[in-house]
Design a protein with these regions (language model features):
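Loop/turn elements at helix/coil->beta-strand transitions in domains of secreted/extracellular proteins
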Residues: 26-31, 83-90, 112-117
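Broad hydrophobic/π-residue packing in well-ordered secondary structure
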Residues: 34-36, 43, 74, 106, ...
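Sec-exported extracytoplasmic/periplasmic mature domains
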Residues: 16, 35-42, 83-87, 111-112, ...
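Secondary-structure boundary elements
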Residues: 1-69
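Active-site neighborhood of thiol-dependent amide/isopeptide-bond enzymes
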Residues: 43-106
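His-Asp-centered catalytic microenvironments across diverse enzyme cores
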Residues: 99-101, 109-166
């Protein structure tokens, strides 16, 4: 999607995303936008999905009703922020190995610098790395887990600023 799309321009201006992303390199912008969504909207997996599911509407209903949204809505919001800033981005539904009637939704964002899609999770403010601190894609995480190789998440990964995940 083109970042000059009028809806994405509106998102970029409404949230002042240029300021949030910062003036650093591409990776720092990706991390800054991830942290901002995580810090702005709290996760509440039991909340109902609002009728309007765009980033601005999600933000406004959460502020108005002092509520959170589920992981899918958080990923939707982050996806729109990335797209508005010119990053290629998608949200991805992750299913457990055994069916348990639940899922988790994360994002992948394309890094031109690293020439790959990166795993990012706004619910946990998390990104996944190898033992050298290199950011990983979903397929790299999967391959490393299958081989029993080291993976970790960033030290500040957490759920709603209450539960660290490291």
């Amino acid at each position: 999607m083109n970042p000059n799309d009028r809806d994405l321009v509106r998102v970029r201006r409404y949230f002042n995303l240029d300021s949030i992303a910062g003036a650093g390199d591409e990776i720092s912008k990706i991390k800054n936008l991830l942290a901002w969504v995580h810090n702005t909207i709290r996760h509440d997996g039991s909340s109902y999905n609002p009728e309007e599911k765009n980033a601005i509407a999600l933000y406004e209903i959460c502020k108005k009703e002092d509520r959170g949204v589920n992981c899918r809505m958080m990923a939707q919001m982050l996806n729109e922020c990335y797209l508005a800033m010119g990053f290629k981005s998608r949200y991805v539904t992750c299913l457990p190995k055994s069916y348990i009637n639940d899922c988790h939704v994360i994002n992948v964002v394309y890094s031109n610098t690293l020439d790959k899609w990166l795993w990012v999770d706004p619910t946990w403010n998390a990104y996944v790395m190898d033992d050298k601190g290199n950011l990983l894609s979903i397929s790299e995480v999967r391959d490393r887990l299958k081989k029993g190789e080291f993976v970790t998440v960033n030290e500040d990964a957490n759920w709603n600023h209450k539960t660290p995940c490291t």
